[in-house]
Amino acid sequence: MSKIINTEEQNKYVIVKTEGYFNKDLGELVISVVEEKVQEDKFHFILDLEQSKIVNSIGASILIEVIEILQDKDGTLSLCHMAPIIEKTFSIMGLTKYCNTFATLDQALAQ
Amino acid sequence: MSNETKPSVELRIPILKDMELVATNTADVIAKYMQLSEEESGEISMALIEATINAFEHSESQKDIFINFTISDDELTIKVIDQGKGFDSKGIQIPDIDSKLKKQERKRGWGVMLIKELMDSVDYESSNDGTTLTMTKKKKNE
């Protein structure tokens, strides 16, 4: 099942960890968290995809909406622990032009 | 392998949520059998997800879709067949993230582009009776 397994805040970042297929449902869960946290003036997000090894373009498209929301607030979306095929997919789509990408969560937090 | 002896696997998939993963699970098994790399296997799975979702969404039909994998020594051929109303593949616009951001533009529409980027060849045959997508992945010699 696709789900968010943890949401926590460290320094200025909201870290969202997902599990399972990154499809429309999971994308909508992520954007809900972002919308909620933006209301609390949190504008910097790290999406940890360690437990999500597969994605579809509908879930990825929702991340474009996330980027749009955060651009309006001078916020950022960082991605970490991406499986190679997810990184390649996001690169083909051009998503990685608008996100910071990191191998690990620690690297994302240290940016 | 001659044409007569090429092994094949056939799936019949109902249009139900996340059923595209049935196809990717099968593709994983076939990729292992063919000793394809992890990279090749991932690319096939991603292309198959997109092809299956497109068949689900664009066929405008509730009829099952069929997926046929044909294995040969040097390549895997996959056909994704829907029984929908057909479409003009030449009419598909290439999406661009720069134009999708900030322009109230629909964010979706990446499937065909991804399939073409991830597979070695892609061909659509479409009529009023449905669409057949044929895509191949060549085995890299390492």
Where would I find each of the regions flagged by the language model?
Chain B
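Short beta-strand-loop-beta element adjacent to the nucleotide/active-site pocket used for signaling
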Residues: I71-I78
